[in-house]
Every structure is written in structure tokens, then in C-alpha cells.
Curated annotation (Swiss-Prot):
This is Transcription initiation factor TFIID subunit 1. SMART domains: BROMO, UBQ. Residues 1688-1797 form the Bromo domain. SUPFAM superfamilies: Bromodomain, TAF(II)230 TBP-binding fragment, Ubiquitin-like. Pfam families: Bromodomain, DUF3591, TBP-binding, ubiquitin. Residues 421-434, 442-454, 1272-1287, 1573-1582 have a biased composition (Polar residues). The lineage of its organism: Eukaryota, Viridiplantae, Streptophyta, Embryophyta, Tracheophyta. The gene is TAF1. Keywords: Activator, Bromodomain, Chromatin regulator, Coiled coil, Nucleus, Transcription, Transcription regulation. It comes from the Eukaryota.
Amino acid sequence: MGDGERREDENPTTSAADDDDDEDYDEPGGGNHFLGFMFGNVDDSGDLDADYLDEDAKEHLFALADKLGPSLKDIDLIKPSAAPTDPSEQDYDAKAEDAVDYEDIDEEYDGPEVEAATEEDHLLSKKDYFSSNAVYASVNSKVSVFDEENYDEDEEPPNDNDLPSDNIVQNCTSASAEQLDMAPSNDNLAVEKMSSSLSEPEESFESEAFQKEMVAEEQLESKTATSLPVLCIEDGSVILKFSEIFGAQEPVRKAKMDRHKRPVNKELQITNFTDIVEEDEEVFLRSTIQNLSALKHIKTNDNFVESDSDESTSDVALRLKDSCLSEQPMKDKDIPTAVQSPVFPDFYPLEHENWENDIVWGNSPTTAIQPCLTSCAISKESLDDHNEDQAEGYVSGCWDVQNKFHSSSVMADPFGHTEIPDSTSYRSPENSYSPLRKETAQENNSLDEPNNITQPVKIDTTRHLNKLSLLNKELLEGSWLDNIVWDPSEDVPKPKLIFDLKDDHMLFEILDEKNGDHLRSHARAMIVTRPMKTSAVENVDHNNQAIALSGRFNISNDKFYSNRKMSQQARSHAKKRATMGLKLVHSVPAQKLQTMKPKLSIKEIANFHRPKAKWYPHENKLTARFQGDECSHGPMTAIVMTLGGKGVKFLVNAEETPLSVKSKASKKLEFKPSEKIKLFCSGKELQDDISLAMQNVRPNSILHVVRTEIHLWPKAQRLPGENKPLRPPGAFRKKSDLSVKDGHVFLMEYCEERPLLLANAGMAARLCTYYQKTSPSDQTATSLRSNSDGLGTMLAIDPADKSPFLGNIRSGSHQSCLETNMYRAPVFPHKVATTDYLLVRSPKGMLSLRRIDKLYAVGQQEPHMEVFSPGTKNMQNYILNRILVYVYREFRAREKPGIIPQIRADELPIQPPITEAIVRKRLKHCADLRKGPKGHLFYIQRPDFRIPSEEELRRLLTPENVCCYESMQAGQYRLKHLGIEKLTQPVGLASAMNQLPDEAIELAAAAHIERELQITSWNLTSNFVACTNQDKENIERLEITGVGDPSGRGLGFSYVRVTPKAPVSNSTHKKKSAAAKGTTVTGTDADLRRLSMDAARELLLKFGVPEEQIDKLTRWHRIAMVRKLSSEQAASGVTMDEIPVSKFARGQRMSFLQLQQQTKEKCQEIWDRQIQSLSAMDGNENGSDTEANSDLDSFAGDLENLLDAEEFDDEDVGNTDIRSDKMDGMRGLKMRRCHTQSQINEEIQDDVAEAALVEKLLEESDSDMKRKKQPVETTNYSTPMYNQGNKMKQGKAGQMIKSSVYAGALTPKESIPREAKEVENFAEGSLPSKLRTKTGFDANDDIILVKRKNIPGKDGFKEKRQGARGDTLVCGACGQLGHMRTNKLCPKYGEDPETSEMDVNSIRSHPPDIVSNAQIKTSNKRLVAKVSSEAFETEGPESIEKAKPVPVKFKCGAPEKSLDRNMSISASLVSDKRMMDATDSKSTGKVNKIKISNKIKYDDYPPDTPKPSVVIRPPAEVEKDLPRKKIIIKQPKVLGDQQRPTELRSGQEPRKTRKIVELSSFEKRDREDDNGFSGQPIQINSSHDRGWGLVGKRSKGIMESSESWRAFEEQRERQEQRLIEARIYDARREDELQKAKKKNKKKKKHEFRDDDLLDPRPYKNDRRVPERGRAAKRRTPADMTEYTPPAKRHRGGEVELSNILEKIVDHLRTMSCSFLFRKPVTKKEAPDYFDIIERPMDLGTIRDKVRKMEYKNREDFRHDVAQIALNAHTYNLNRHPHIPPLADELLELCDYLLEESADVLDDAEYAIED
């Protein structure tokens, strides 16, 4: 069954339709149907109903007279001599005499094609575009920067034979005509058909040689007709035709019965060729496809042009050079040779084409190759026309018609590049030919020389013959056999695309790639802006420019016809769009978000509107953790970093000088070696002639490069070349292009302090000017457009159109503005001072200077977009989309063959409130979370996941969304800066304010909070967009004037929304009480109708109305004026005794139109003032700043007093940073007093960012150079590492037993850097969030790491293991592992979280006037431990990072509680077991630089510097069953144990009374107990007994018998006794020191040193809000008064006295003697306490009274402190004799502090009395 028969069976419906078409062929007038279809006024006989055709139509019809039948011959269309009969001779380039050229018509049309052409032209005057030093050939050249811009200018290849820029329709028509005339057929029937249908051309294309070849071929075919079919004769051998022998042999049938039936998609049919009658369909199909294409084109081209079909259908005919097959839809391809693929994918036209004739045989006779050459020459001519059209930039037809057999997407490239889609089922004949090679082209070009053909047609023919003389490599190699389709159901594979650089028909884009130079040197045709295979998203980039691009190719000038047919509604929408402007196209880096950071630092957010740069290096202590030991020789790593943030790592020698380092860095940092630069290390400049080692440059140090030379850019105003695009998407394709090194620079200065929206680098903006016409015929805008200087795009506004701004532009004037996709803002030009230049610094530190072209002042923004509101779904979706886009782009960038892309989880820009769990769930569809070999988590791309295209990514996240989110972050930071953290919307604040008491301070604070929330960026933008989305119809819903005015002086608009029904205050109610009366007026003396003419006259005279004006008014006009004036004065609260204002006042209700008109008038007034203010060249802009800010300053003072006096017992600290704690401690308007705190935090952020960059650079190095060290993590406790002590070898040297806690605890307090805690926190960055400790110096951290347990009778220690649950639970109160804060077994269960604050304060508080040395017991045992303070000071930060597993099993006895200020090294050395074996000391190697000494040097231990000793016990005293290779590191007894009083043995005393006795110790032992609780607790009445019971219970689990337990109890009691004795001694010693101090007559101001209070005083930070499940955080001890500006007080001395007394109370609370008196005594601790004590008092109550400012003098304060001492003597004198001395000590210390502060207290008390 043949192919045609098979299709008949499959498509019976289509076959029937074709049979009907066959019947149409028999009709005599069949051609008239087509003519009637075209015009509709031609009858069946071919006569015209009315002769209304114009000359062009008659001319085209006359050209078709031979095809359309004899009926048209009788019509007098045109004179025969007027036009040639052959279409090929028609001069399509010549214009008719009456032709009107609409291409350059200047009509008033504000469409985008006009705007795009004029935007860049009017930014500057022509003289500004050229530099004085620039050389241009001719300013008046045809291609100028002032002409219409064209994105395709850079696409024109350097081809001298470019076609003239003509109409595409003319090109298509002429090309088709040439094809038709030059297409001889191989078959006689086809030749007859062509000759009968077309008129004879005057100039024949065929030469005499061609005719001879055709005759020879006909003779050869006639000879072999009766035998086998012969293709050609080569070397005497006959080559037969493959298709005739092996093809399907079918008898010759008539054309009517032998037509191949094909399915037709009725929906996509365009043309039905009913009048093409062929005698032999098979012969017709065997003819070249070019002939068929030309035949169809000449039949249908004019039809489509002249028809009334829609625009898209007409565009099909205009764009396609060759039409589709009969009754077939158009395909998704645009093959250059106009070959259209058949419908079916299994339809292969091999059997319907003489493909053998196209084979080029090297030695074949001339007669065999001539037909093929002729046919292919025609095809090549069409190809030339197509490629020349491409060179001109014409868009070829590539239509997105979906193929029903294949679903591959087709992308339409607007720059004319054709891409064969995957669904192509036909291989173009040209693709099978080998491209032209250089050597072949030279050989063939020599053929032209001897012939010397002068005719252009012959030259072209020879050129095509030369191109076709190549051999088919696929045919020679036999590879074409692999492409034969044997199975009809199998799709034809996609043809190969051969790139040949020597082929001038192939255009190559020169990208910035490595092979770019190679392409430039070898390609015959270039340069194309767009890539050959562009992505779908890059096509979307041109959608915004599609209208502008179509203006060049829109020959029909549709805009002039579409405007006339446009409806009124469409016209209004067009005006709105013209007013609002076009959507701008950003640069490629901005669209890819390359210019925007995923996460902004605090410094960037704080300075969001005024970014700050780093211009001078300073010491970064956070990077000290990466530095190595000092080395005097050998190689080391140095990181050279610029101030712009560019860092490069180098390998240098310690003996090298900075000069050699400069030479190494000169290449990578792009500066000349001779350039003068400076190197800084740790904030100090390095000398060039001294080695790095001599200048203390350590390994991994940062060397900052400061470049001092300034480069001048005198020619920076130059524009790019004329053939390059000036705006996106063609321009600014790389980040490096976004520079000010060339082009023009306009500086825009915003008048708003905090603009609502700010664009990032690379985002588009447009400068345009609106001109308000005086009349519809005003042409001033045209003159301004041609003579504009810095006006940008000129847009005219008709008098009936609305203004694009809130205010109206005056008639006849113009206003410039800056437009982006986010906002519109008016701009006002200013003159640039001659002394002003722009200083530019590159990321590599180069300084450059250039001129400034224009300077503008930007007015108030009118937003088009809403800023995200915090906590909303839109904000969360944005963060998730940002993470998704980041992951997708990273996956795409890391795609490599055989490698699955993966991303580290910690690299994702996760920001709150998004958590890792949400991110993991969101990325579940594209990536799997897996753990790497080193424990890092990675997101690995799923194998079945397809990365979205760039277009989808850009739609998912736009640059405008990033700007909105950054603006939200800046607004949130400002609220936090003001102390508003939880509120983001002012909803409900008005009703809440009504419930507040009638106090001015509280109402002012609430009003301030409400005002700050109203003027946030998200509220203002939301209000404006909501009120203006209907073309500013609801602008009256905005306040226009009020708190939202950014200027504060009436120069800006307030976008705060008016409250519909605001709560009316009492004062407002009183003011309008008169207006509320309505029904009680009638018939009384207040009735306005009863006013006579004279009475109304008298009232108006009293109101101040002129008498002349009154005389002109009638009675009712006078009454109306009386009502108006009375109502105005009553509403304003003005009263006049002589005028009864309230009687005639009436309530006024404005209509909607009146309200709208009033709002417009307000807007116009503000608009005029803004223009006048910002346009003024010289004016005192700050004249009224003092007046405007006076109210705010007064309010700020009142609010400060309120915040000082307000009581908040509990508040969250919220930050683990020392300096961040300082910032959080100063909330609200107190930031005014400590303005330097924000600068400190900005420095911290810079240091952290720099440290992160250093860490990244070091991580990228080899494994030997890595400094990625981590401290001993808390997770190591109770892990198998501690259980492998027997397996570790003792001989390893260089291992150190260190932890971040010890590094901080052992460092002397005087030398602790301010960033010590930051270093620790940075080191703990890898710890889990649950296990990260909040306090670096807290003893609780020591407990987590190490624990000492005492076993009576034994000196050895046993390990304690935890269960699985104990490893995961972390207590929020004490910070220990193994339980929760709600556990009753917790040592801090039921305690006030404030007590934990004292843990830190006590270890830091060592005032020199109170320090006492404990008794030193010098027994016969050796004291061997001595800690070098210098070692810990210098090696502390580094030691944190060098922590490694220790090759021995050890137990460290942590200081279970510090001994506060009395904890000295003298007391710490008290121990009866301090022996060390030399063997053990050698085996352990170097342990934290511990120095061993034979004797004690008392001078080495200053009394205020605690240095815990490290005791290494000899193995002789260790239990025998324990391994010998064990180091037991213990803290001394006095340091580690607690002083607990001996329990009274009288069994009659209640156990609860014992609680107070136990509290007499310096620190509570139960806080420091280890965490892994096991077993059931014993029954204990008090909490501290419970803590001791827990210790006993845990130890009991380790014991083997009850005897051990009893021994343990005895040992504990002995320890308590020793602790009590030491405590009593310390108390006596302190008393002696206090008395000695008092004897000193010279007053010495007490130093509040860093040991006492390291941080600034927390103004509310030490008051916490208890929350369940939140970890207790230590309060920030603070005293920064000497580093901060003096406090500003507005309520006299009460606040000052309160601050001084609060400081004294805080200092008392930090003292060890105050431990028992810090909080009230409860009945649980002492049941009979309140029966004896009538007036309880404690330091907590005193502090509360101080904060409430209840103390008016110091005597009242001291009286309460003395009450504490009196209560202590009354209750504890007989019960606990050691407690009263503590109270006396506290009172003495209070007297001392009061005496030290006597001067400031006198001033404060004097201010209170005044």
C-alpha cells in the first residue's frame, strides 16, 4: 500500500473533502472564486460590480491576469505600458508619484515606540555628548547618537553587500519573483506548466550553456526510458536512480485520481488553493519545493496583504517569505531555505523529490549536474535573500504554533535568529551539504577570472555554482545511512547543526568568553547581540521593548489607524499608561540579583538611606583567632585586603618586607608596583624596609591596603560606540559595566530623610518631563523635545488630562520627574559647583575622580508598590522565594557532567521568622538534605528535578521585591532603635489609649508609639497605593497634612490614612459643643432666621468684615456669613465676650465633592511650596529646624523621664554579644545619650564580616593551611570521647587541654579585651543552638564541660555516664544538661531568674578597697601550680581555636561557684593536696603553657586577680584500680567548694531553718552541680537540701556500699566547716580594710572598673519577663557613664538621684556580703521570720523603690539599708551568729559608696529642693 493510499485509509473525512475540491477544478470559472474571496465584489463571470479600485490594485490585478482567467482582460485596469508584465521587472524600490511616506511621520502620539526613541536623546544637550578630546569623524553623520536608537545596530555584520533598507514586503515579493523566474524544472510537464502560467521575462536568466545541458539530459533520459533509470554516467559507468529501482513502483495516473490525501487541521487553515490544477500530482511533487513555494507565494501574497483579515493573519503573510503547503497549518519553524516540513513526523519526502539530482559528483559529466545546480542555485538565492534580511535586522517568521505530535517549546527570537526545534521532522537539503571551506572557496573563486562575465546574473550564478561544488561528506562516509527512517512510526532525529566559521551565512555572537578572540579572528560574519540559542527568559527581556522594536518594522504604520479606531475607554487607558509611564527594563545583573546581597548586615540596615564606607583600617580582634604564633622565619600566609572588601591570600616569608608583599599583590589588585600604597596590620602602618616578623606580623594576619593615588577620568563623559546599545537589555550585561568610569553621571539627592523605597545598583530609572499644554493645539512640547537640556523624555499633558502628581502642573509649565517601577518623584535641577567632583573607589581600592554632569534634588516619592509588612504572608513568601532562587541558581552554576550539585545548608540566606525546618520542607521537591563526611549538612539536587528557566526565576523574584524587603528591614530597625519591638501596626492603639489614665506622660508615650507606627514605610506605601489605585479618586482618604509629612514643615504630603471615626477627646467635644445643637435652635434667640439686616450687620462688623462688603450682601447672604464665621471660631475654640459666637455656630457637613475639592486645594498648596523650596538655588533651608524640632525635643525629654521612672521588673536581654548587650540595654530615646553605641555595633558588624571573609579564604586553602579550629564543644561531655581514655596514647606532644571558658576565666580582668566574648561566641558558632551558652565567664559553662566529684577516702575519680535523654535536654535556668527548668530537681528550680545575674557579677567584682586575702595555709605539702597571666593574655583567643582531643583521660574540677571579689589567687592556693609527679608532667606535654615553680611568689599574685591553680596529682595517690595515665585537673578547695555552715545537731530545730544557714556561703553549690540526674531523689524539705541530696544521690549511684555513702556525708560536712572558717576570716579581713580606708582623709573617687561593671548600666535590661521554655540569660552588668555623654534630665534632680542610688544598689548587690539580702525572705525558708521582724527589707525592695523615685534624699536610702542590718541582728543573733557581721559589712560598704558620691548627691538633692 502506497503512502498516499495509507493516508486515504487513515483519513476518510479528509479524502472526501479533497474529492469535493477535485470537483471544483472542473468548473470553468474556478479561478473567480478566489478573486471573489479576495474582494467580494467580483461575480462568477469575473465582472466587477463597481470599478472603485485604485491604481495599485489594478496594477496587481493586471499582473495576475493570466492566472485569473479571461474575464479580467475586458476590464480596463491600466495601460499595458504602465507596468511590466513580469513581476521580476517591477521596480519595487521606486515609489509612486503620489505615495505618502508614513514611516517618519511626526504625529502626536505618546506611544512607547516614540518614548523609547527619545529617552536617551534628551537627557543632555548635544554638546555634552562629546568630549573635548574625543575624535569623531563627523558629527553630522547619518548614524548619530541623537538619531532614533536601535538595539540592532550592533548586529549588522561587516558586509559590503548589504541590501538597502527597504520594505520587507517588497523584498519578499521581489525575492519570490526572482525565484519564480529562475526556477527551471527537470520535468517537461513542470516546464510547460510554468511557461504557460508565467509571462516570458525580457531578460532571460538561462545561458546558452544551460540550454545545452538540458538538451543533453533530455536525450539521455529518452535513451534510457525503456531500460533501467539512469542517474548519471561517471567514468563510463552508468549510475542508476535509487528511487526508481527500490522505491514504490506505481503506474502513472491522472492528476484527479492520483492525489495524495493529507489530513487538514481545519482550525489552522489559512488558505484554500482551489484553483491550482495540476495534470500530474506526482510530477508536481517531484519538482523542487522552491518551485511550489514560489507558485504559492505569487498566488497568495497579494491576497493576504490586501485582505481585511486580522492583524495576526496579515502579519503571517508579511513575515513569511514562502507559504505553507496546500491546506496545511504553519509549522513551528523557520528554515532559511523556505522548505516547509510536512504534517506527519513519519512523512519523509525522499520519494517525492529528485534528491539524486542534487548529488554533486566530482567526475560526473556536465549534463548530469546541470539541473541540480540550477535548482540549488535558486535555493541559494533564496538563502542569500534571507540572510541579507537577517543582516538588516528583519524578523523572520518563527511562530509558536503548537505541534500536535510534539510538545517541544519554540522560542521566537526577536533579532532574527532561527532555531530548528526538536519537532523538526524534515532535514533541509542545505543541512546535508558540507559548509564552505576557505581553501575550497579560493579554488572556486578562480573560476570567475577567465570567464569575465559582466552580467550580474551570471556573476551570481557562478558564485552559487562555486558554493555548491563541495562534496557531501556524509554521503562519502556513508553516515547518511544511519539517518534513514525505516520505521514509519519512529520520529526523524533532529538534524545536526554544523558550525563553520568560514560560512558567511552563519552569524556568530562574540561573547565575553575564553574563545571570543578565536571567533573574532576566524568568523566570516559577526556580531550578533543575542545568542544563537537564547533562553526563554531573555526573550522576555525584549517583551518590554517589543513595541519600540516593532516601530522600525511596522511598515504599515498601524498606530495611525489604530488610534482612529480606538474606543473612548481604550483612549483613556492609553492616557493613563502614558501618564504612569512604561515598565522599565533592568540590567541583566540586576535581574539576576547579582547586585543585591542576600542578607544585609546591621550596619547596612542602620545606614540604609545613607550608606557608610570604610576609609581607614582599624584593628579587628575577631580575626585574632585565625592568627598563628609569632614566627621569625619561614613561610606563612598573609591576607591582603582592600578597604572595599576585596581580599586575596598570599604565601609570604616572615623575612620579607612589606615592599615585596606589595609587588606580589600588584597583579591581583591591579595597581602598578610604582604606585604609592600603604600596608596596615592591626591598625598600624607597616614600614617598607622592615621585615614582617620584626613588625609582629603573624601568620594569617590581615594586611589592609590603602591606595593614596587618585586617578583622573577626564573623558568619563564619553558614551559607548554608536553601534552599541545604550540601555538594557543590550547594554549593561555584566556587573563590571555598572560603573561610572564612562557615560554620564546624574546625582540625585533625596529631600526625604528616609525615602520609602530605594533602588539598588543596576535597576532602571527614567528621567522624563511632563509639559502641561495651554490648549490642545499647543506645540511647545515639540520645541522642548528638540532643544531639551537634561529634560529627558518629554511628555505632553492635555488640558483635560489629570496631572501625574498629587499637585497640578501650572498651564504652560513643565515638571521633570524620576520614574522607576517602584515610585515617581519630582526632580529639580541645580547647578553643579565648579569645585565639586565625584570620588570613586573600586572594590580593589583604586581611587578615581571624574566630573558630574547633572545635579538634581528629588522631591517626595509617590510609591507604586507596597512595602512588605513584617510578619505577613507576603514577607514570608519573599524569603522562601529568595532561598529558592538562590538554590536554583547555585545548582545551575554547579552543574557538571557526572557531578550532582550540592549546597551547604549554612550557606542559605535564612532570615527570621523562617526556620531551618520550613526551609527543609520548602526545598523537599528539589533537594535532599544529607550529612557530609565532616558533619556538615548539604542540600543535594534530586536527579528527577528540572531547574526552572531563567525566565521563571526572574518572575519568581523581581528586583523590586528585594527593594521592598530591604525597606521593611530599615523600618524595623528604626522601630527597634526607638524601643518598639513587638508592634508593627497602629491597629487598636487608639482604643487602647482611651483606657489609659489621664496622665500627660503616659498619653504622650502612647501617642509617640502610635505616630511612629503610622509613618513606617509599609503603612505609608500601603495607604498611598490603596488610595490612588483608582486614578487618585480616593485621595481624600489621606491626611495630606499631619505626622506623615517627611519635611515636618508643610512641604510634603502625609500618606497617613484618615481614621473614619476617630475617638473624640473631651477637649474636642467642648470645642464643638455649640455645633452639636440642631433641634433646640428653632424659635429661640439663636435662630439665624430671626436675625434682621441690622443685627447681622452688627455681628459681621464685630467679626471684622469690611462695611463695604456688608453693604453688597443681601439678608440671607449676611446670615450665611454669620453662620460660617461663628462656626469657624467655635470649632477653633476662639471665644469673644462681646460676640455670642456659640449661639449662631452650626455644625458643617461637607459633601463628598466639597471634601474632594478641599483635598485638592491642600495638595496644590503643598505642591507649590515643595516646588518653591526645592527649586530655590540659595536659601536658608535650615532656618526653622530649631522651631520644628522644639516640640519633639520637649516630648523626648518627657518620655525619657517616663522611661527612667517606669518599672519593668523583668525583660529579655536578647543578645549574646557584649557590645550588643550594651546596645540592647539602652532602649527607647536613651539612644540619644549614647549615640556612639550604634557606631560600636557597626564596627562589630564590619569586624564580623571581615572575619567571615578571612575564614572563607582560609577554608579554601589546602588542608595544611586550614585554621578551622573549634573549641572543646559542650557536646563532648558524656560522649564516647571521654570513654576512650585507655585507648589514647600518652606520648603525643603538643596537645592542649583547653576550652573557651577557661580561656576567658583565666585571663586577668585588666587585660580582657572588649571583644572577648565576641571571640568566644564566634568560636562557638558551630555548636548546636540548644547548647550554645550565653555567658562566656559564667561558672555554669565550666560545669557543662568538666565536673569534679569528691570521694571520701579515695583520691581517684570515676566517670559518670549519661543516658541518651540527658544528652539532649538543656536546662533553661542553670544551663546544665539532662533536665529542664521545670524539673524540681534543678538547682535553680523556683528561684528568681535575677539571681543568676549575680554569677557573672560576682566573678568580675574586685574593688581594690575591699579585697582581702584569704589565709594561706602552708603545710608540708608542695604548692606547685602557678599560672602565667601573660601566657593566657596573649594566647587566650588562639587557644580557643586550637582545642583538640586530649590523648589522656582527664577530669577537670570546675569552679562550682566563684568566691566573688574575695576570690584571690592566695586563697585559691589553699589546698592540702597539691602534689605533682614529674613523670606525669612530661607525659602530658604542653598544657596551656603551665609554668611549674618550687615556691610561691606572693608578688606574682595580685589580690584582685584570680588565677585558679591547676593541680596534677601523682599516680601514687590515685586509686590502684584506675589507669595510671590519667590527669586530674582540680580547682582548689577554697575556689571550688562552698562554705556551708555546719548543720545544727539539735534534732529539734526544723530543717527549713537550716536554709538560711546554708545561704551564708558565697555561692550556692547546687547551681554548679552536674546535670545528668539519675535515680529517684531523696526526700528533702528545702531546695538547697534537695541540691545536696542530688549530689549525694548521684555519688551514691557511683558508690559500691552504704559505708561509702556515710563517708561521703562526713567528707561534705568537713568541707562545709573549712568553708565557714575561711568565710569568717575573709569577713574580718574586709572589716580591717574598710576601717583603714575610712582613716584616709584624702577623698578618692571610687573606680568602677571593668572588674566591677564591664557594661553600661542597663536601664531596663536587668528586668526580665519570665517565659516558659526560655533560657535564663544573665543580666548585662553595666557602667558606661564615663564613656557616654552626660545624661539629659528634664525633671530636676529626682531622676539624677535615682540613677545614683540605683548604681549604688547594683554595686551592693554584686558584693559577696549581700548574697543573703538580695531578695526577700520567704516563709518557706524561715517560717517564723515575719513573726519576729516587723519591717522586712532587702536590696531588691530598695532597688524597686529607687526606680520609682521614692527616695528624696540619701538619708532615707541609708535608713533602709540600716534596716537590713537591724533585721539581721534581730533574727540571726542567737540562731546564726555569723550572719549579722555580713549585714554590718553591707552597711559599711553602703556608707562608703554614699561618701564617694557625696558631691553628685548634693547636686541632685539641691535640684530636688529647688
